[in-house]
Each structure stands twice: as structure tokens, then as C-alpha cells.
């Protein structure tokens, strides 16, 4: 996930990582968002959709919450079974066949969320690096500013060039950051 993934892995602890991901999730998807809440002894990552996604809704929530669970396990070293996932939809027909590979999951709940012990929030991350976390967060800020600045392609390119420090990116790099091919960028 580019600088966002690098930044998340480099944060000092899980709480910082979740807050960084929460702030910049729009760099990866505009369909979903999530927020961190505390309820008693539990930390809760509540997921929501920003747009109607129709038939993809269940798939998107499954993908997001299972990905966050696996990522959290990877960066902390905690067991994937240390928490539980809640979904607001009925148990899918395939669940029993994959249940043994997944963390505890509860269906027909009020919200789509990942729940785990609050104490995990302060746990140091395996790959914590404050310098890398700062640099990655700064790059994410630049990417977000670029994304929000305009839908006008020439304006986005100018903004991107003005944010560079000491060099100009190649055409392919600019196109990649704008999520298009170099050929499409030239036409626009």
C-alpha cells in the first residue's frame, strides 16, 4: 500500500498505526472508511461505507476487516485470534468451511467492526521507526493534498511538481501517482 503501508508499519504503536491509516485511507479507497473507538477494555475499529456499494457490500466489509486483522497481527506479532470481528449481515454459506482459518467472527451484529483488547493499542510495533513514520506521513499528506486539490489533471500535475524536493519525477511516476497510464496522462 505504498507510503501508507510503510507509514503504518513504522509507527511507534498500534494506536498510532490505526490513526494514520484512518487519516489516509482515502489514498487507497474512497468506498470505505473506519474510525477507532474505545469501549471499556476494548478498542473497536468501526468500518463504514461512504457510498452505496450494492452487491459488493458484504465482500468489501469482509475484505476490509479481515485485512485490518491480518495487518494488525503482522505489525504487532499478536495472534489473529486475539480479537473478534462483527458483521451486520447474516453468516454466509461458505463461512463454516473457512472458519478454522479466521479469527472469531460474529454475524447479525449492529455494526461492522474489529474488536480487540485496548491494551494492544500501546504495544510497540515490530518494525517501529520514528524517522520512517514521519517521512511516510509527510508523503501521505502531500498525496492527499494533491488528490484533494483539484480534479483538473494539469492542476494536479503542477501541484505534484511543486511538492517535489530537488527533482522532477519521470512521466511514468507522475502517471502512477495519478492512477493512470502515461499514455492517458499525455492525452489529458
Model-derived features with residue positions:
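N-terminal low-complexity or simple alpha-helical regulatory segments
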Residues: 1-42
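Short, highly charged low-complexity linear segments
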Residues: 14-15, 37-39, 77-88, 123-132, ...
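Short capping loops/turns at secondary-structure boundaries
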Residues: 7-10, 14, 53-61, 78, ...
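DNA-contacting interfaces and partner/effector-binding or oligomerization modules
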Residues: 32-33, 37-121
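Short hinge/gating elements
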Residues: 2-8, 50-54, 121-122, 140-143
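Internal, well-ordered alpha-helical segments in soluble enzyme and binding-protein domains
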Residues: 17, 64-67, 132
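Short secondary-structure junctions and interdomain/linker hinges
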Residues: 11, 28-32, 75, 143-147, ...
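Extended mid-to-C-terminal alpha-helical interaction segments
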Residues: 92, 99-188
Amino acid at each position: 500500500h505504498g507510503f501508507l503501508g510503510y507509514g503504518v508499519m513504522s509507527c511507534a504503536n498500534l494506536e498510532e498505526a490505526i490513526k494514520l491509516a484512518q487519516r489516509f485511507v482515502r489514498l487507497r479507497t474512497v468506498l470505505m472508511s473506519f474510525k477507532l473507538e474505545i469501549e471499556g477494555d476494548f478498542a473497536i475499529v468501526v468500518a463504514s461505507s461512504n457510498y452505496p456499494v450494492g452487491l459488493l457490500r458484504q465482500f468489501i466489509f469482509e475484505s476490509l476487516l479481515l485485512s485490518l486483522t491480518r495487518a494488525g497481527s503482522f505489525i504487532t506479532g499478536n495472534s489473529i485470534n486475539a480479537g473478534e470481528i462483527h458483521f451486520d449481515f447474516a453468516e454466509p454459506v461458505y463461512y463454516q468451511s473457512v472458519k478454522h482459518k479466521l479469527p472469531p467472527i460474529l454475524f447479525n451484529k449492529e455494526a461492522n467492526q474489529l474488536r480487540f483488547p485496548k491494551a494492544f493499542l500501546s504495544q510497540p510495533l515490530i518494525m517501529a521507526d520514528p524517522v520512517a513514520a514521519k517521512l511516510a506521513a509527510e508523503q501521505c499528506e502531500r498525496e492527499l493534498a494533491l488528490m484533494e486539490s483539484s480534479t483538473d489533471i494539469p492542476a494536479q500535475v503542477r501541484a505534484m511538481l511543486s511538492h517535489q524536493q530537488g527533482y522532477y519525477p519521470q512521466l511514468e511516476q507522475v502517471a502512477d501517482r495519478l492512477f493512470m497510464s502515461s499514455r492517458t496522462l499525455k492525452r489529458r
